[in-house]
């Protein structure tokens, strides 16, 4: 599933990377680098959720986030994922995650070192926008934010 070029983040995806790192800094956590493999995984998942109009950590192939990240080349043991739908912008989506008792601890996990971000749009969906952020505890190939 790997390609020769790095994934390209749009303006809001880049804003999300910066916002997650700012949130972590507010809580004394180190910044995360942007992982190529995790970004590919997150982008694929956001598109899969949008395509199927389904907000779920299990993808259309029946994989959980751990299996999917493995398939995209991120095989390190420490992993996490947050997903959201309904907002096009990073600030509103991060606010959803920060308010969630399940997602907030993942964003602030001390052992994390890298992240990957993806968002996708389905104009036919009531949600319209779907977001995925994948996280890992081992630095592999990274790219600039």
Would you name each region that the model predicts?
Residues 31-32, 56, 76, 114:
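Residue-level detector of short coil/turn "hinge" positions at structural boundaries
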């Amino acid at each position: 599933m790997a390609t020769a070029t790095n994934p390209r983040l749009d303006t809001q995806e880049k804003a999300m990377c910066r916002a997650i790192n700012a949130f972590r800094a507010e809580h004394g956590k180190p910044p995360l680098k942007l992982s190529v493999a995790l970004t590919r995984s997150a982008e694929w998942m956001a598109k899969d959720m949008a395509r199927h109009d389904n907000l779920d950590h299990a993808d259309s192939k029946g994989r959980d986030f751990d299996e999917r990240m493995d398939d995209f080349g991120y095989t390190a043991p420490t992993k996490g994922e947050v997903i959201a739908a309904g907002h096009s912008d990073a600030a509103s989506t991060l606010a959803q995650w920060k308010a969630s008792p399940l997602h907030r601890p993942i964003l602030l996990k001390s052992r994390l070192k890298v992240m990957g971000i993806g968002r996708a749009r389905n104009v036919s969906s009531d949600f319209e926008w779907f977001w995925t952020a994948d996280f890992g505890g081992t630095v592999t190939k990274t790219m600039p934010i």
